[in-house]
């Protein structure tokens, strides 16, 4: 399930970028802690939030909605509400992945195995989804593009996710 949610998050991000800006997607993607706090407190008693944490969470959510309000109204800056809603869904999928790991025995799996599983599921499902959608595949690589992909793979998709999985295994998710 964690691998499917992980793949779905990235599929959602791809679709989102066709309907809103990368900066708006980033903000909505990082609503993941909201979803974790809302859902994990129901499933794991040790993850309960104190009243002041709930107040802070609500204030942060209202601030995000206020900052991005022009995309929610007709005639707003490009009317990006569809993309914003999908971005919120991508954030929810990331949150659900975290909840799935933290609230199950998956939290005992080593970070590198968890990352491998999630990437393996994505590596199979996302190209199949791309083919099913009739996406054109262009392979024009430059040295810069190759180096950029290598940096993103090693740092963005390996080191950062290993650290995240390690943190989930050692600390309450609502405290990270």
Predicted regions and their residues:
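Hydrophobic alpha-helical transmembrane segments of multi-pass membrane transport proteins
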Residues: 1-19, 38-39, 65-66, 85-100, ...
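Short alpha-helical transmembrane interface motifs in multi-pass membrane proteins
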Residues: 24, 52-56, 81-86, 144-149
